[in-house]
From Swiss-Prot:
It is found in: Mitochondrion matrix. InterPro entries: Fe/Mn_Superoxide_Dismutase, Mn/Fe_SOD, Mn/Fe_SOD_BS, Mn/Fe_SOD_C, Mn/Fe_SOD_N, Mn/Fe_SOD_N_sf, SOD_C_sf. Its main location: mitochondrion. Binds 1 Mn(2+) ion per subunit. Its cofactor is Mn(2+). The gene is SOD2. This is Superoxide dismutase [Mn], mitochondrial. It comes from Pongo pygmaeus (Bornean orangutan). Signal peptide: none annotated. The modification N6-acetyllysine is found at residues 68, 75, 114, 122, 130, 202. The lineage of its organism: Eukaryota, Metazoa, Chordata, Craniata, Vertebrata.
C-alpha cells in the first residue's frame, strides 16, 4: 500500500519510466479496510469491483505497457515509444489515482479537517463549506469520466481545486500535488447511485479521511 503521507505521486510508483531497464512490476495495493467498511455511503459490491477488478486492470495493463515500452527503448524504436504514451498515461494514471483514493477514504472519516489544513482551506476558499461546494461542483461538472481534486500548488503555497478527465494524473498533467481525489467514473458509484452523481458526491463526504489528507498536506509543506 502506498504511504499515506507522501508529497509526490510519481515516486510512489517506483521505478519511473527512466528506470525501466531494472523495473519491478507494479502490484495492487491492499485496502486499509474491508470492502463493506464504508457502508452505507459506498456499498461493498462497488468497493470490491472497483478495487479487485478496475484498479487491478490498470495495474495489469500498466505492467504490460511498461514491458512493451522497455522493448521499444531497447530497440531505439521512438515511434513505438510515442504510440505507447496514451496507454502509459491512462493505466499509470489509473494506478496512481486509485492508490491515493483508497487512502483518502475511511470508515472513521467525515466531518472537517483540523489544524493547519483547515486554516489553509479557510484562507484559500473562504470557509470549509465553500470549499466543499467548489470541489463538489468541479466533480459534478466532469464530462464523462474523470476526477475532482484538491491539490497543493507548491510554487504558490496555496490549495487549488482541479478536475481531470479520464485517468489523467493530477501532478503529471497540472503540476499540482494531489491531496484529495474524488473518483467520478460511473464504476465508482453506479451500482448504488445509478446516474445520480450528485447523490454519490453528497455521500462521499461522510467517509473522507481527513487525517490522510492532512498528512499529505503537511508533507508537501516541508
Amino acid at each position: 500500500m502506498l504511504s499515506r503521507g507522501v508529497c509526490g505521486t510519481s515516486r510512489q510508483l517506483a521505478p519511473a519510466l527512466g528506470y525501466l531497464g531494472s523495473r519491478q512490476k507494479h502490484s495492487l495495493p491492499d485496502l486499509p479496510y474491508d470492502y463493506g467498511a464504508l457502508e452505507p455511503h459506498i456499498n461493498a459490491q462497488i468497493m470490491q469491483l472497483h478495487h479487485s477488478k478496475h484498479h487491478a486492470a490498470y495495474v495489469n495493463n500498466l505492467n504490460v505497457t511498461e514491458e512493451k515500452y522497455q522493448e521499444a527503448l531497447a530497440k531505439g524504436d521512438v515511434t513505438a515509444q510515442i504510440a505507447l504514451q496514451p496507454a502509459l498515461k491512462f493505466n499509470g494514471g489509473g494506478h496512481i489515482n486509485h492508490s491515493i483514493f483508497w487512502t483518502n477514504l475511511s470508515p472513521n472519516g467525515g466531518g472537517e479537517p483540523k489544524g493547519e489544513l483547515l486554516e489553509a482551506i479557510k484562507r484559500d476558499f473562504g470557509s470549509f463549506d465553500k470549499f466543499k461546494e467548489k470541489l463538489t461542483a468541479a466533480s459534478v461538472g466532469v464530462q464523462g469520466s474523470g476526477w475532482g481534486w484538491l491539490g497543493f500548488n507548491k510554487e504558490r503555497g496555496h490549495l487549488q481545486i482541479a478536475a481531470c478527465p479520464n485517468q489523467d494524473p493530477l501532478q503529471g498533467t497540472t503540476g499540482l500535488i494531489p491531496l484529495l481525489g474524488i473518483d467520478v467514473w460511473e464504476h465508482a458509484y453506479y451500482l448504488q447511485y445509478k446516474n445520480v452523481r450528485p447523490d454519490y458526491l453528497k455521500a462521499i463526504w461522510n467517509v473522507i479521511n481527513w487525517e490522510n489528507v492532512t498528512e499529505r498536506y503537511m508533507a508537501c509543506k516541508k
